[in-house]
Amino acid sequence: MENFEEIINSKTPTLVDFYATWCGPCKMMSPLLEQVSKDVGNTARILKIDIDTNRNVATQYGIRSVPTLILFKEGKQVWRQSGVPSKNLIMESVNNFV
């Protein structure tokens, strides 16, 4: 992914969803992240990364299971969660860094 480093280095917190098209739990994340996106508006960004088409990025961040969410703020990893967390947990984590 060409602009990945630029995006995660911005001042706007960026929640990255590392997923795979064949992953059942990953499919459950999409509607959840759509709700989170509506709730956070422009205060945070949500980015989806397919680990099968972006293997270098997945390897760089040690993604071993999907879905994995990583929240970046100014290039630093500030929160990480594997599996399907609750919307409340995601919102709480994002709101801590906006």
List PLM regions with ranges.
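Non-catalytic, surface beta->alpha helical segment in thiol-disulfide oxidoreductase systems
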Residues: 71-98
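Structural microenvironment flanking redox-active thiols in thiol-disulfide oxidoreductases
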Residues: 51-57
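Short pre-active-site segment immediately N-terminal to redox-active cysteine/selenocysteine motifs
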Residues: 11-12, 19-22, 65
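Hydrophobic beta-strand anchors of alpha/beta hydrolase catalytic cores
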Residues: 15-16, 46, 69
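Typically the conserved alpha-helix immediately C-terminal to a functionally engaged Cys/Sec
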Residues: 27-40
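A short beta-strand-turn-helix
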Residues: 1-13, 55
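Structural micro-motif
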Residues: 62-70
